[in-house]
């Protein structure tokens, strides 16, 4: 729990008053509540449906997550993403995309957030074959056999 406290406090401090919109599962929300972490810019809410979550992502300056799927969405949309893991289910998100892995290290999170807040985040690009043409390629393969 102490590490969660340090991560949350780092996010709040480094956000410098910018709103932190944090959809969290119940057990994480409860853990944060039990730690007594509050800030005027911290908005904790339950997980959101796909469309509203997509809206939130599109409006974000950056994303902090532990989800590989969220890192994928961020890479596809060109949104800076900080992943609180030492691995990624989709390595292309950090190899060529907008994702950076910082683990659960508050110091690494602080450095990444400093880079993000200064506007110096890596640009990233779409990984190969993330062009939205998958169905077209599948049809091509099926009709050529």
What label would you give each PLM region?
Residues 21-23:
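Short beta-strand segments
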